[in-house]
Every structure is written in structure tokens, then in C-alpha cells.
Amino acid sequence: MILRAALVCVMAATPLAAQQVTSAPGGELRVLDKITGEVTDLTLATGETQKVGPLSVTLGDCRYPTDNPAGNAYAEMTIYYRDGADPVFRGWMIASAPALNAMEHPRYDVWVLRCMTP
């Protein structure tokens, strides 16, 4: 039992190999209007803002695994509703699991599709 506990401590202290990531020049996002069913795809450069209806969507960064450009993209976004003072979403969203950090809005969903790769 003591040996097992010591092994767990050693494994916890050993850093995991970090996955190398690359920042893309931009990304692709999808916006869904849950009332009308309208879907809009956005292609944004890093730092660019686009309006979709009452939403203003800004892409801060889009990153992907360096060794697998088609792999799991994740993007940092800031989204405002009707030019409000406070964003309805600010943070990172993972393309393969947008629900992990989802935008909470009664009418709109926004999620990452992919990063633009060279």
C-alpha cells in the first residue's frame, strides 16, 4: 500500500509532455439562431470582429496541434450582444467539445469549427 502511494506521488510530480500548438492566422466559427434555425459560418482573422444579427464576434486566437493541423482546434473569443457593455461570452472554446465552455444565451449558439491553416 505504501509502495502504491509512493508511486502515485511520483507520477503526479512528473510533468506530462505538453502538446505543441501553433497559432493560426484565423479561424472558422458557426453561429446558430435557435429561434429561426438560421446557421451562419464566419471566417475571421485573428483580432477581427464580425457582426451576425445582434452579435459582435471577435476572434482573439485560434490554436491547433502542431503535428496534426486537422486536429482539435480551440479558439479564444469575445462575444457581445447588442453592443452591450459586458460580453455574453469571453474565453476559450474547444472545437470537439464546445459544451465544456459554452456561450449561455437563450437565442444564439456559437462554436468553433476549425482553425485556418497555411
Specify the residue positions occupied by each region the protein language model found.
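Sec-dependent signal peptide recognition
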Residues: 1-8
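N- and C-terminal low-complexity/disordered segments
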Residues: 3, 16-118
